[in-house]
Curated annotation (Swiss-Prot):
<feature type="binding site">
    <location>
        <begin position="162"/>
        <end position="170"/>
    </location>
    <ligand>
        <name>NAD(+)</name>
    </ligand>
</feature>
<dbReference type="GO" id="GO:0009056">
    <property type="term" value="P:catabolic process"/>
</dbReference>
<dbReference type="Pfam" id="PF09290">
    <property type="entry name" value="AcetDehyd-dimer"/>
</dbReference>
<comment type="similarity">
    <text>Belongs to the acetaldehyde dehydrogenase family.</text>
</comment>
<keyword id="KW-0520">NAD</keyword>
<protein>
    <recommendedName>
        <fullName>Acetaldehyde dehydrogenase 2</fullName>
        <ecNumber>1.2.1.10</ecNumber>
    </recommendedName>
</protein>
<feature type="binding site">
    <location>
        <position position="273"/>
    </location>
    <ligand>
        <name>NAD(+)</name>
    </ligand>
</feature>
<dbReference type="InterPro" id="IPR000534">
    <property type="entry name" value="Semialdehyde_DH_NAD-bd"/>
</dbReference>
<dbReference type="InterPro" id="IPR036291">
    <property type="entry name" value="NAD(P)-bd_dom_sf"/>
</dbReference>
<keyword id="KW-0560">Oxidoreductase</keyword>
<dbReference type="InterPro" id="IPR015426">
    <property type="entry name" value="Acetylaldehyde_DH_C"/>
</dbReference>
<dbReference type="InterPro" id="IPR003361">
    <property type="entry name" value="Acetaldehyde_dehydrogenase"/>
</dbReference>
<feature type="active site" description="Acyl-thioester intermediate">
    <location>
        <position position="131"/>
    </location>
</feature>
<keyword id="KW-0058">Aromatic hydrocarbons catabolism</keyword>
<dbReference type="GO" id="GO:0051287">
    <property type="term" value="F:NAD binding"/>
</dbReference>
<dbReference type="GO" id="GO:0008774">
    <property type="term" value="F:acetaldehyde dehydrogenase (acetylating) activity"/>
</dbReference>
Length: 304
């Protein structure tokens, strides 16, 4: 039995609960706490049934237990506007924060594009962009590593049932954060992000459209090869990531149409947007946990 790094999850909604199922399978991470603000929350009840300690008084109610339970990584699946405070309080106790909100106070991480860059940087807060960002930025990066991209636009369509109250409150932050990461991580000079929440019944699988305008005529063979290689990288942790059509070339425009089917851990398989976000968060935390177990990463308290 290898040593596991103890984790806490903040926010027992769709994302937090789906993440809990994934962490339960992790060889490096052990979820021990679930933190919420509503004692009647379904997510907290489910976490209790799964053997976790729970707290319904927010992060403040959890702080006294951090050191005694040796919690070293926390996942924030709440909302962008409370994340900064949550992060400050936990960083002060030496807890590494994986941010699944669009707060983006830490550096962006999209695993197949830049996870390795985070190794050895000793960051205490890493932001997972958004579900739309995780699904589309690898495709923008696949084009921009072949040749310069002047403009990258992504359209993420998710089912209404998969978008909980937290996601809805964060729509503006979603578009800003995703557009910023299309530039910073995807490599586009200018980025734009659009989200569509589709109320259709039965719920639709997550669909993503990516358009890139290249500065010069696109090298079709190299871009096609790069896109297929990147899809294989994403499929290592999200097997339901699939190319529906493309790349389609029209002048300098390169378009890719993706579909993301989930594993069905918490919500049914249509909620690929949950899967790609939680799988990316778990993958990132596992990399840090492996370093901690090896002794190459020691977390230090950060006082704001």
């Amino acid at each position: 039995m290898t040593q596991k790094i103890k984790c806490a999850l903040i926010g027992p909604g769709n994302i937090g609960t789906d993440l809990l199922y994934k962490l339960k399978r992790s060889p490096f991470l052990e979820p021990v706490w679930m933190i919420g603000i509503d004692p009647e929350s379904e997510g907290l009840k489910r976490a209790t049934d799964m053997g976790l300690k729970t707290c319904a008084t927010g992060v403040d109610g959890f702080l006294p237990h951090v050191l005694e339970d040796n919690v070293q990584i926390a996942f924030d699946a709440t909302s962008a506007y409370v994340h900064a405070e949550n992060s400050r309080k936990l960083n002060a106790l030496g807890v590494l924060m994986i941010d699944l909100t669009p707060a983006a106070i830490g550096p962006f991480c999209v695993p197949p594009v830049n996870l390795k860059e985070h190794v050895g940087r000793r960051e205490m807060n890493v932001n997972m962009v958004t579900c739309g960002g995780q699904a589309t930025i690898p495709m923008v990066a696949a084009v921009s590593r072949v040749q310069p991209v002047a403009y990258g636009e992504i359209v993420a369509t998710v089912s209404s049932k998969s978008a909980g109250p937290g996601t809805r409150k964060n729509i503006d932050e979603f578009t800003r954060t995703t557009a910023g990461a299309v530039e910073k991580v995807g490599g586009a000079k200018k980025g734009k992000a659009i989200i569509i929440i589709n109320p259709a019944e039965p719920p639709l699988v997550m669909r993503d459209t990516v358009h890139c305008l290249t500065e010069t005529a696109p090298d079709q063979a190299a871009i096609t090869e790069s896109i297929h290689a990147m899809i294989k990288e994403v499929q290592k942790y999200v097997p339901g990531y699939r190319l529906v059509n493309g790349p389609v070339f029209d002048g300098n425009r390169v378009s890719v149409y993706m579909e993301v089917t989930g594993l069905g851990d918490f919500l049914p398989t249509y909620a690929g947007n949950l899967d790609i976000m939680t799988a990316a968060g778990a993958r990132t935390a596992e990399m840090f946990a492996e370093e901690m177990i090896k002794g190459t990463l020691k977390l230090e308290p950060v006082h704001a």
